[in-house]
Amino acid sequence: MFIIELIKGIILGVVEGLTEFAPVSSTGHMILVDDMWLKSSEFLGSQSAFTFKIVIQLGSVFAAAWVFRERFLEILHIGKHKHVEGDNNQQRRSKPRRLNLLHVLVGMVPAGILGLLFDDFIEEHLFSVPTVMIGLFVGAIYMIIADKYSAKVKNPQTVDQINYFQAFVIGISQAVAMWPGFSRSGSTISTGVLMKLNHKAASDFTFIMAVPIMLAASGLSLLKHYQDIQITDIPFYILGFLAAFTVGLIAIKTFLHLINKIKLIPFAIYRIVLVIFIAILYFGFGIGKGI
């Protein structure tokens, strides 16, 4: 049984790594895979299972931090300073990157404030199957609207052309995505596209902005729940973290490589199908009623 439970922990880490930064809602997938199927709370205990999810989320966050490590060093003015591509070498030498630490901080402020104010309320009242289904569906519609709009934009901006107002508006959408199932990346990438960024630029800024705030949020959660960690559960935590980190690296790099080509609508369609599937399990078979 111990081996089977370890495999379950790895599966959850894989799911987290695949979905945390994709615009499909990691929360929705965790409800489907864990709460409705694997039920980690049954072999870890409810409190330890909650802490386990924080740990595997950290695995995904560290993966994103690694992918964007050079950009973070540039933003913090550590190491070599790169420049924006221009029409010639002189332009490249004279135009520094516009994305800086203030852009990231401006984007983090709305979610940071609302997170501190409403984190406990959201944790207690909004983590249910019906609310997650609502978030999945509404988020999918928002993504479709963003993609339809982006088709009309002739010269979408790169991440280094972002201004502070755009950063702030994208930050507000990150706060809206605190509703479980809405998807942080789905919300912020869509908003970035609506603010006339190209899909890759919106994705880059989404991940860069998300890493520090998610590290802070996960760190606070661990401080609140670290006492729930049992020594016997440590193998689950380690394997789950490593699975989320490894799969997260692959998923993030693949997503960033493809997003300008495939856009958001395929993910939106997938979300709607996922809502239908969860609804059938929940309303048709009563699976997940206790969540």
Curated annotation (Swiss-Prot):
It is found in: Cell membrane. It comes from the Bacteria. One of its GO terms (biological process) is response to antibiotic. Keywords: Antibiotic resistance, Cell membrane, Cell shape, Cell wall biogenesis/degradation, Hydrolase, Membrane, Peptidoglycan synthesis, Transmembrane, Transmembrane helix. It holds the Pfam family BacA. One of its GO terms (cellular component) is plasma membrane. The keyword Hydrolase applies. Bacitracin is thought to be involved in the inhibition of peptidoglycan synthesis by sequestering undecaprenyl diphosphate, thereby reducing the pool of lipid carrier available. Belongs to the UppP family. This is Undecaprenyl-diphosphatase. It comes from Staphylococcus aureus (strain MSSA476). The gene is uppP.
